[in-house]
Regions:
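Residue-level recognition of tetratricopeptide repeat
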Residues: 157-158
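Catalytic core of nucleotide-sugar-dependent glycosyltransferases
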Residues: 84-92, 96-121, 141-154
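Conserved nucleotide-sugar donor-binding catalytic segment
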Residues: 7, 17-101
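Generic helix N-cap/helix-start motif at coil->alpha-helix transitions
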Residues: 122-127
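Conserved donor NDP-sugar-binding/catalytic core segment of glycosyltransferases
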Residues: 1-14
Length: 168
C-alpha cells in the first residue's frame, strides 16, 4: 500500500497509509478503513479466496472496507511504503463524499463482522465520531454535533468525543 496525493478543489494533501499493524482485524473494526483501494496491489487469488468484493446495495461506498476486513481475517500481510505513487481526486458530489451514506454503509459492514456487543458499540461509536469529524471539517457543525452525540451514546468512555462535542 503506497501513499497518495488527495486533490481537492482548493488543496492537495499528502496521505500516507499504515503502519502494517493497522491492517489487523480489530484495528480495522475499531479505527475504521485505513487503506485506499487505489493504493494497493493484491494477488487476484487472495481476493477470490475471500469471495471478492460484496455487491450488497447497503454497503456501497464501503465495499473496499468490507474486503479489507475479510482479507485481514485471513492474516494477509501487507507492506506499506511512504512513497507517493498515486493521486486521488476528491469530488464534492461523489458517492464516497456523501458522509451520511458512507457512515451507514460502514455501519452495515461492521455489523456484518462483529457479534460481540461491546466491540460492536465501540466500532459503531468510532463510525459516528469519524462522521462528526468530517462534518466539522466541512463546516457543518450541527451535523457534526449530532454525529458526536450518536458516538457518545454508543461509547461513554471515549473522552475524545467530549472534546469534539465542545468544539462543534
Amino acid at each position: 500500500c503506497h501513499g497518495e496525493y488527495w486533490n481537492n478543489e482548493d488543496k492537495t494533501t499528502k496521505v500516507i497509509y499504515g503502519p502494517e499493524d493497522n491492517f489487523k482485524l480489530e484495528k480495522l473494526l475499531l479505527r475504521g478503513n485505513c487503506i485506499s483501494l487505489s493504493a494497493i496491489v493484491i494477488k487476484k487469488e487472495k481476493i477470490i479466496d475471500v469471495d471478492c468484493f460484496s455487491t450488497k446495495q447497503e454497503i456501497i461506498t464501503a465495499e473496499d472496507y468490507d474486503l479489507w476486513i475479510k482479507l485481514s481475517k485471513q492474516n494477509l500481510k501487507l507492506h506499506f511504503t511512504t512513497k507517493v505513487l498515486g493521486t486521488y481526486q476528491i469530488h464534492k458530489n461523489s458517492e464516497s463524499s456523501n458522509i451520511i451514506r458512507n457512515t451507514h454503509a460502514s455501519i452495515k459492514v461492521i455489523e456484518g463482522h462483529i457479534k460481540d456487543q461491546v466491540l460492536l458499540n465501540k466500532a459503531l461509536s468510532n463510525c459516528w465520531k469519524i462522521a462528526g469529524k468530517l462534518y466539522y471539517k466541512n463546516g457543518s457543525n450541527k451535523d457534526a454535533f449530532k454525529s458526536f452525540m450518536k458516538s457518545l451514546r454508543l461509547n461513554l468512555y471515549d473522552i475524545t468525543i467530549y472534546f469534539y462535542l465542545i468544539i462543534s
